[in-house]
Amino acid sequence: MDWQGHNLHFSDHVIHYYGNGNVGKPALVFCHGFSDNGLCWHRVALRFTDQFDIYLLDARNHGQSSRGIASAQDMTQDLADVITALELEPVIAVGHSMGAGTVAALAADYPHLVAKMILEDPAWSDEDDTQKTKSMRKRAAGFAKYLEMIARLSDDQLLAMGRAQHPSWSLEDFPSWVQSKREVDGFALKGLIRSPWQTLIENITCPALLLYADETSDGIVQQNVVDQILSLNPCFQCKQITGAGHNLRREQFEAYITAIEAFLN
């Protein structure tokens, strides 16, 4: 499918998104993780294209959206502004990692904009403030080195690296993954710092599905965090995807789709 690309112009920035033009159907909005882009949802979105009006957003400093300093709060505001400008509310919002944090913040701060949400392994842990600061600095430094490294690779080299690192992924996932790595800006690192997730959880009132990985994998959300979420907010359902790491949908695609379909139905 050829997704239709569009730009939304705001006062000082542009947000790019892709859609299927299925106006009149319920809106399903996807928010990607750090260094990905909207098209990285292509394979999942195809499974829902007949039932929904789909929007694949490029976050600021990713894809074809604007470059420049943008905080996590700015990205939440961007998502709210897009939904409002296109008169989509209330939407079903899906997010992975960084995008999951954006979706959760949207549901907490703008409850009227979100009917349901699905979060794929957000960056939520039970570290204390000191540990979180250290972890964030370590992650930011690691991401910065990663961006420098991939900038030196050709597309063929980047594809070979991706396939070697992620042998369980479908070949369909790699074209958008390679493209996204050419479209991420260093300013994107500023969007990774967000308020404590516990505060967000307490303010969420819509039905929510959290999908998390095996504890032995590279997933971020651990069982103790899941237990805290369920104790803090009865709106949440939490499901572990067996055999998956942080990129749940790419590693256990059918199980991921089945979980979403069950939640939406």
Provide a role label for each language-model segment.
Residues 13, 46, 55-94, 98, ...:
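Active-site loop/oxyanion-hole signature of alpha/beta-hydrolase fold enzymes
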Residues 13-64:
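Conserved HGGG/HGGXW glycine-rich cap/lid loop of the alpha/beta-hydrolase fold
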Residues 244-253:
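Catalytic histidine-centered segment of alpha/beta-hydrolase-like enzymes
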Residues 46, 209-244:
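Conserved loop-alpha-helix segment in the C-terminal half of the alpha/beta-hydrolase fold
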Residues 129-131, 147-206:
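Conserved alpha/beta-hydrolase catalytic His-Asp/Glu region
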Residues 108, 115-147:
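Flexible "cap/lid" loop of the alpha/beta hydrolase fold
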Residues 58-63, 123, 244-245:
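Short beta-to-alpha linker loops that shape the active-site pocket of alpha/beta-hydrolase fold enzymes
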Residues 102-106:
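Hydrolases whose catalytic domains are alpha/beta-hydrolase-1, hotdog thioesterase
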